[in-house]
Amino acid sequence: MALLFLCLIFGTGRTQKIEAADTETDQAAAAQDELLAELDFDAIQQEVDSLLSSQQFSFAGTVRSLLQDGDPFRTFRAGNAVLSCAKTAFLAQKGLMKELFLFVLAGAVLGSFSSLFEGKQVRDASFYMVYLLALALILKNFQSSGENLKAVITSLVAFMRILTPSYYLAAAAAGGASSAVMFYQMLLLVILAVEKLLLALVLPMIHIYLLIALVNDLSGEEILSHMTELLETCVNGLLKSSLGVLVGMQMIRNLIAPALDSLRQMALWRTAEMIPGIGNAVNAVTELVAGSAVLIRNCFGVTAMLVLLAAGMVPAVQLLVSGLSFRLLAAAAQPVSDKRIAGCLAAAGKGYAMLLRLLLTVEVLFLLTIAILAGTFS
């Protein structure tokens, strides 16, 4: 009888613990659903559909999936996507590379035949003909790549603008009012820097750099070499400075804002504990809601980061393939063709590298802005 009584006591205690755990799970799920209902996923999804027109991506569905299993890489498989993008970019550049390779061969053949004639007129005429045709093709392709890059960055800025109010609300609900304000202010500053500095100044400087580099190779006397070096230094300096300054400002402010939020949360919980009779219950519910809000905020941020990565992956791979193609063609042309043609191709490859660096700078700025906020109270 005594043994049966002990079994009933322990069995009842375990049942109560299980019921309490189930109740807490239900309360957490209810709190998550209530917080998710306050977020505007429709406007975000419209911008995601515009940004990822060739991919099917559900923003709200990904957030809910992360809330359940917490694995962001289950919905984002980058390996096959990168290979597919590289293959598509290579096929897109294949025609241009064939034409430029034919121009390189034509320049080499014409240069060999022109050496049989007296004087430099025939050789110079053949060189200028080939060089100007190659220059026209390079500038046309580079202009198209620059316009595509500008459209991608503009779409990324529009996505971050739509994302900001909902992410601000999620961060504020997580008990991080000061952190949410910091995020809002810093994101506006990052968007301003991207639009007014990177798009309005750095991108045109890259185009000017390539044009001057091509003209410099055309003259053959290096009369504009210092100008190209100056532009390259300015572009690289502006990209590095913008990244360092903006990220540094966020890191410094992130040392203060989370501490203020933590102090306010602690004061609120201590006040709730002092309420007679229901203090512990209120404190438990408050901690549950705060934990759910932090989880939603971080899942929301990770989903936004996945969208940014998916949106920037295709143009980044395209620019990388284009730059490598021009560099390889320049290396192949140097032994058989005029050094100015090889220099022209190498300058185009360097221009594509600058475009890629610009895109990566924008991506890193947005990703770190989200990651710094998501890292608080994690």
Q: What spans do the regions from the language model cover?
A:
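Helical hairpin unit composed of two closely spaced alpha helices linked by a short loop
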Residues: N298-K339
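Membrane interface segments of multi-pass transport proteins and intramembrane proteases
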Residues: S115-K120, T154, S219-V235, A333-A342
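Mid-bilayer segments of alpha-helical transmembrane spans in multi-pass integral membrane proteins
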Residues: M129-N141, M160-A177, L197-M205, Y209, ...
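Gly/Ser-rich, low-complexity
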Residues: L4, L8-V104, A108-F127, N141-L156, ...
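Interfacial loop-to-transmembrane junctions
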Residues: V336-L356
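Small-residue-enriched core segments of transmembrane alpha-helices in multipass membrane transport
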Residues: A125-L135, L156-P165, A193-L199, L230-G244, ...
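Generic multipass alpha-helical transmembrane bundles of integral membrane proteins
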Residues: F183-L306
